[in-house]
Design a protein with these regions (language model features):
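N-terminal glycine-rich phosphate/pyrophosphate-binding loop and immediately adjacent elements
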Residues: 3-132
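Active-site/ligand-binding neighborhood in enzyme catalytic cores
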Residues: 114-242
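Core beta-strand elements of the Rossmann-like FAD/NAD(P) dinucleotide-binding domain
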Residues: 268-277
Length: 284
C-alpha cells in the first residue's frame, strides 16, 4: 500500500489502477446502512510503522490513530470474566484476581516477546535476499542476517529457533497456568490464519501484535478515526500531493509482456497503460 507513495515522492510518475469505485483494498470504510459507516475488512492498526507515518506526513492528510483500549474475555461457561486493561497496574491486579502466579509471570512473558520481536523488527524494512543468487546485494544481505543470528550466542539462538517453530499453546504453557488467561493470550496467535493454537509455528504470530507501535507506544494497537478507510485516504492524499494519479473503476484485463518483461496492462475498456515498472497485486 505504501510503495506507490514513496515512488511518487522520489519523483516517479505513478498511476494507480483500482478496479473498485473506492480505494483501499482491505483498509476501507463502507456505508453499510444510511448514515452508518463500518470498517468492513481490516479492523485495527497494529503493524503500520511510525517512520512511514512521519515520512509521508499522514497526520497532515487527516490520519489520526486512537489507542485501542483492550478487550473483555469470558470463560466457556460464562462464570468468569477477564478484562484486558490498558493501565499496567490495573492489568496486573486483574490477572492476580485469577492467578497470582500468572500475574507475576506476565512481565517475563512480555519481556521475552519483546526480545524476539526486536530481532524481527530489524528486518521489516529490508529487502529479503535470494539465497540462490551471487549478486553482491543478496550476498551482503545474507551476511547481515547471519551476523544477527551469530551475535545471539548459542543459548539464545536455541531459544529463538524453539520459539519460531513451536505452537502458541506450548509457548503460553511455559508462562501461565490459568486456562482463561491462556485462551485470551492465545487468540492473537491464530488471528488471520487457518491454524489452531497447537499448530507448529503459531507462536511466531504472537509477535505480529507486539511489533507495531501507535504514537511511540510499542506493541500498542490503534483505531483510525473515521474507520480504517481513513488510512487509505491519507495515503491517497500523500500520493496526489507528489503528482501521483489514482484511477478507480479501472479493472485490468490483460498484462502486456514484451521480451520476457512486463511493460503495461490492458483495461477492461480496452485502454492500454504502459510503464517502465509495473507493480501488480492481481490474484491469479
Amino acid at each position: 500500500m505504501y510503495k506507490r507513495q514513496y515512488l511518487a515522492k522520489a519523483g516517479l510518475n505513478v498511476v494507480v489502477l483500482e478496479k473498485n469505485d473506492y480505494i483501499g483494498g482491505a483498509a476501507v470504510t463502507r456505508e453499510m446502512h444510511e448514515g452508518w459507516f463500518y470498517s468492513s475488512c481490516s479492523y485495527v492498526c497494529s503493524m503500520m510503522r511510525q517512520s512511514i507515518h512521519r515520512d509521508l506526513d499522514l497526520t497532515r492528510h487527516g490520519l489520526l490513530l486512537v489507542p485501542y483500549l483492550g478487550t473483555v474475555n469470558f470463560s466457556d461457561r460464562g462464570d468468569r470474566v477477564l478484562i484486558d486493561y490498558p493501565d499496567e497496574e490495573a492489568a496486573y491486579l486483574e490477572l492476580r484476581r485469577h492467578s497470582p502466579h500468572d500475574a507475576d509471570a506476565m512481565s517475563r512473558f512480555q519481556a521475552d516477546l519483546g526480545r524476539y520481536a526486536q530481532l524481527i523488527r530489524k528486518t521489516l524494512l529490508r529487502t529479503p535476499p535470494d539465497p540462490s543468487s551471487f549478486k553482491p546485494r543478496d550476498i551482503q544481505e545474507l551476511l547481515w542476517m547471519a551476523k544477527q543470528f551469530w551475535n545471539l550466542g548459542e543459548r539464545e539462538l536455541y531459544e529463538y529457533i524453539r520459539f519460531f517453530t513451536m505452537s502458541a499453546a506450548d509457548f503460553l504453557h511455559d508462562y501461565f497456568e490459568d486456562d482463561l488467561i491462556k485462551a485470551a493470550m492465545a487468540s492473537p496467535g491464530i488471528i488471520g490464519t487457518a491454524l489452531g493454537v497447537y499448530s507448529p509455528g503459531s507462536a511466531y504470530i504472537l509477535l505480529h501484535h507486539v511489533m507495531g507501535d501507535v504514537d511511540g507506544n510499542v506493541g500498542a494497537w490503534g483505531l483510525a478515526r473515521g474507520g480504517m478507510g481513513a488510512i487509505s485516504h491519507a495515503l491517497a492524499g500523500a500520493l496526489k500531493e507528489h503528482g501521483g494519479e489514482i484511477r478507480t473503476e479501472a479493472p485490468v484485463n490483460q498484462i502486456l509482456v514484451k521480451n520476457g518483461a512486463t511493460v503495461g496492462v490492458v483495461l477492461d475498456n480496452g485502454d492500454e497503460v504502459f510503464a517502465d515498472i509495473v507493480v501488480l497485486s492481481l490474484i491469479h
